[in-house]
């Protein structure tokens, strides 16, 4: 048996923060899960011990308490879908049937009054979530939330096809899949709701703003893969993970794959920091708040990842760090060799050109 991997402290230049009502929110989310009977009794019993309310409180440390609670319930609901149907349920091996279920759930999210799936706990929970999204968000934010949920569902069906076939995608396909099946993009509208504003399309749809949101998703999901590798590798079922993809594609040992994954996420973290700081200098107060929330999302996922029993697995402890470092292992400005995301680094050249255009030409004597 190969020696157990030890995850070193990961690079994080972002400060830790948490909502002061985190303990109350965690209790409320556990009660919400019981009220709507999310997942099987066994799964629900696990989810309510995983500090999901605390995770939400780390994502929105200064947000409206009602939205922090909404986000916590939504994250738990997502785990009810992912753990209950995709990862551990039979539908996770039947992509066609899984697509049918998820398509029906999307209809419930779009039109909660539709008389369908009325005895389904996940549908009931989703109806409650949709009503609360309507209460705290605008019509545009609600529409983007539903659209992002569809993206998430689409990606987990793709993953289910690999699970059924027992195949591992290449790194580019895995990266593209992971940007969505980590359910990070579906959280983004709630970052705005949590602070009572709506980022306007002229800023939200800018290439650079979209890119930093994708970078945040990459960092969060790569970190999740690093933290969950111990649990997933020790399990008996099929699993997809960045380390496994790197092992297969590049012929690496688990230790080498861990080093490669850390290098990749460090390089993206450095790029995220540079581009988000540039955007903050020229953006509206709403954009600056959005960028701050992306940072909180990244750091919140990190702090939750090294502390939740979901990943520390006390019965079979993982060798996880208890702190983070402010020194990256890789601060190169060269693009990652992943076509789906290599264009992110084009933003550095675009910013340099923008700076040159702003510098007045020197007149000759």
UniProtKB/Swiss-Prot annotation:
Where does the entry annotate site (Plays a critical role for substrate recognition)?
83, 159
Q: Which SUPFAM superfamilies match?
A: Terpenoid synthases (SSF48576)
Q: Its annotated pathway?
A: Secondary metabolite biosynthesis; terpenoid biosynthesis
UniProt KW keywords: Lyase, Magnesium, Metal-binding
Catalyzed reactions? (2E,6E)-farnesyl diphosphate = selina-4(15),7(11)-diene + diphosphate
Outcome, altering residue 55 to L/W/Y: Drastically alters the product spectra compared to the wild-type, comprising linear terpenoids in addition to selina-4(15),7(11)-diene and germacrene B
Cofactors, names only: Mg(2+)
Q: Where is this site: Plays a critical role in the stabilization of intermediate cation?
A: 55, 79
Enzyme class comes to: lyase
| Protease recorded as keyword | no
Described by its record, this protein's role is as follows: Catalyzes the conversion of (2E,6E)-farnesyl diphosphate (FPP) to yield the bicyclic sesquiterpene selina-4(15),7(11)-diene via a 1,10-cyclization, which requires the abstraction of the pyrophosphate from FPP leading to a (E,E)-germacradienyl cation. The only accepted substrate is (2E,6E)-farnesyl diphosphate (FPP).
Protein name from the UniProt record? Selina-4(15),7(11)-diene synthase ((2E,6E)-farnesyl diphosphate cyclizing)
Organism, scientific name: Streptomyces pristinaespiralis (strain ATCC 25486 / DSM 40338 / CBS 914.69 / JCM 4507 / KCC S-0507 / NBRC 13074 / NRRL 2958 / 5647)
